[in-house]
Every structure is written in C-alpha cells, then in structure tokens.
Amino acid sequence: MIYTECTDPDVRVEEDYVVVSDGVSLRTIDFTPPCDTPERPMVIFVAGWISLISGWKDVLKKVTPRYRTLYVETREKVSARFPERAHVDFSMPRMSLDISEILERKVVPEKRVCFAGSSLGSTVILDYLSMEVRQPEESILIAPICELTYPFWLPLLLRPVPPSLYTAIKPLLKWYLRNIRLDKHKEPEQVKKYGGALDAAEPRRLKANAFAIKDYSLWGKLPDVRSPVLIIGAESDTLHGLDVMNRMAALMPDADMEMMSSNRETHSEKMGDLIVEHMPGLKGMER
C-alpha cells in the first residue's frame, strides 16, 4: 500500500518488518515528519483486530505531520510473516510482548512515547501497561475490550470449520456485525469498513487468534496500570460497552474517559486532533 493518504508529502515513511523473539515478523510503518527531534515525543499506534491502516487514514493524516508515529500491525494481520512449520502463539501475553520487543528495537530509550490504540489494540496496550515495562507518557485508547467472551454458539460453529471454509461462514459473521453489533442505519461506513477487514483477513490466523484470546480478561490487571490513560468511547457504539469502559477507567489509578458521538467519529480527523492535543508538550514547543 502507498501511504500518501495517511500523511503529508514531506513526511518520511519507512515500512519495516521486526522479527520478534519467536521468529514472527511484524510489519511496522514509521512516519517521521521534518519537525521530529530527539526531545519531541512520538506516537505508537496499535490498531484493532484485523483492522486495516486505510481505516485510520483520517486520524493518521492529522497526527503524522506533527509527531513521529510508529504504526504497528499485530500478528493476526495478513501482513505478519511466520516461520515455516512453526506453531504460532496468538495469545494476549504474546501480543503484548510483541509491543515490548518492537519498542525496544525501533525506539531509543531516551525517546518519550505515547500510545494510541483501538479495540483489541487498546486491550493489548493495557495488558502491556500492567507489567513492569517501559511506560509511555500517556495512552489514548479507543474502545478497549476488557474481556473477550463470545456468543455461546460462535465457538461451536467455528471450531469444526476448517479455515478453507471461511468464505462460506463469512456472510454469517458479517450479518452478526451488521445487525447485532453495529448500527447499520446510522453508521453504514463502519459496517463497510468492518466488512472489508473481514474480507482481507487470513482465515487460519483469524481462527487461531480468536480461540487463543477466548475468555481473556483485563479486570485483575487494570489496578496495575499506573501511567495515565484516556479511554475514548462512542455514544452510538454497541460493539464496545460504555458501562464496561467506565468501570475500567475507575479501576485504573490515573485514567479518564471522554466521549465521541459515534464509532465513525473515533476514526475521523477529530480523533487525530484529540491525540495531538493530548501529546505532552515541551516548553516553547508547538504541538
């Protein structure tokens, strides 16, 4: 993909693969604007489950010309490269370890960082933050998922289905998102976006990841998240429970919650402006 839609012409863009400790290669896209300096903070952006970077172009377009931004693609994405004949771990602890290792490889220790993420990416970030690891200045997290539970019928449906038949059940997954989890009347663009992400997903990884994170919970880890967190919810979002996010914020020592009007707005330029506004400032430095 050409990343011109995600940034300005004078921003340097470098696509790279980071080989993590279990041999998996994860794609990163590093946006570096001319204004970046060693003292200027940067953004580490981790998107949601099977999310495509094209779905975040409006957000990135606002952030990348102002701050170096490292966009990280998690291991369930089709871009990840796996060692031959290897059993790949898709669990949450492994995914948060990926963040730690990418940070170690791509960002010097002196560089101040802020995390941004969405949905499952936000969950991975919170799992990472709960450990004794390098901490960011702040994390801005859209609709984190606190516990990964599925409708009782979904594992029963998916477990016996080989990945080769993913095409056959994909319409059912789209129907579930469109009619149960999303507002197809108010946000048809989001329905289209999630449908496109399902179309682009790699079936074997999708299934393996879904079962590896099944029944995962953040509840016991949230009190250990000590660095500042801003949770972003959407008033019309039925995919991520607002009551749950409020409870999550209450359990963290330094967390706040802010609302946007819709899921679409959390993927808009307004979200990019919010990230810029929350970046830590330096004396005499423009945002």
Task: Give short role names for the model-derived ranges.
Residues 238-244:
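Conserved alpha/beta-hydrolase "acid-adjacent" motif
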Residues 150-151, 168-222:
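Conserved alpha/beta-hydrolase catalytic His-Asp/Glu region
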Residues 71-116:
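Active-site loop/oxyanion-hole signature of alpha/beta-hydrolase fold enzymes
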Residues 130-131, 136-165:
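Flexible "cap/lid" loop of the alpha/beta hydrolase fold
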Residues 27-82:
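Conserved HGGG/HGGXW glycine-rich cap/lid loop of the alpha/beta-hydrolase fold
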Residues 254-287:
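Catalytic active-site module of serine/aspartate enzymes centered on a nucleophile-bearing elbow/loop
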Residues 117-125:
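Gly/Ala-rich beta-loop-alpha elbow adjacent to hydrolase catalytic centers
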Residues 225, 231-233:
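Short beta-strand/loop motif that positions the catalytic acidic residue
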